[in-house]
Every structure is written in structure tokens, then in C-alpha cells.
Curated annotation (Swiss-Prot):
Pfam family membership, one: T3SS_ExsE
Knocked-out gene: effects: Deletion mutant deregulates expression of the type III secretion genes.
Gene3D superfamilies on file: 6.20.290.10
Biological processes, Gene Ontology terms: cellular response to calcium ion; negative regulation of protein secretion; protein secretion by the type III secretion system
Name assigned to this protein: Type III secretion regulatory protein ExsE
Keywords associated with the record: Cytoplasm, Secreted
Annotated region described as Disordered, given as residue ranges: 55-81
Gene Ontology cellular component terms for the protein in this record: cytoplasm; extracellular region
Organism of provenance: Pseudomonas aeruginosa (strain ATCC 15692 / DSM 22644 / CIP 104116 / JCM 14847 / LMG 12228 / 1C / PRS 101 / PAO1)
Taxonomic placement: Bacteria, Pseudomonadati, Pseudomonadota, Gammaproteobacteria, Pseudomonadales
Record's subunit section: Interacts with ExsC.
Length: 81
């Protein structure tokens, strides 16, 4: 089989945005345009800056995760009521 040409798949105009998850009470959808991805990442960065800035333990845990250390995730405990 020989491939003559390749072009990116264009999203259908009538296909509505499909929710793929939730974050902070909002549904998260796949962005059709690359610029929308950037604004979503920027929004997440702003949220992290606001909510983590005052807590040194959270900052340290996020830094360890950014450095590739998974112990903050492994060390989580489940609260029991």
C-alpha cells in the first residue's frame, strides 16, 4: 500500500465538544484549536499559583513531582470517616 498524501483530520462542525473529564467543578473538553490548549494550560498554571503559593508543603510536593519523584503521590493517605 502506498500513501499518496497525508492531511490532518478536521473536526466535524456539527460534532459537539465531548467532555473528557472534570477539574475544579468544570468539565474538560478536547480543544479543537491548538491555541485553546495553551489557554487551558495557562488557566491551570494560574489556578496552581493561586492555590499553592501560600502552602510550602504543597510547593515542595509539586516541585518533587516536577522533578520526577512520585513519592508525594505514593505517600497519600485516605481519610476515613
Amino acid at each position: 500500500m502506498k500513501i499518496e498524501s497525508i492531511s490532518p483530520v478536521q473536526p466535524s462542525q456539527d460534532a459537539g465538544a465531548e467532555a473528557v473529564g472534570h477539574f475544579e467543578g468544570r468539565s474538560v473538553t478536547r480543544a479543537a484549536v491548538r491555541g485553546e490548549d495553551r489557554s487551558s494550560v495557562a488557566g491551570l498554571a494560574r489556578w496552581l499559583a493561586r492555590n499553592v503559593a501560600g502552602d510550602p508543603r504543597s510547593e515542595q510536593a509539586l516541585q518533587r513531582l516536577a522533578d520526577g519523584d512520585g513519592t508525594p503521590l505514593e505517600a497519600r493517605t485516605v481519610r476515613r470517616r
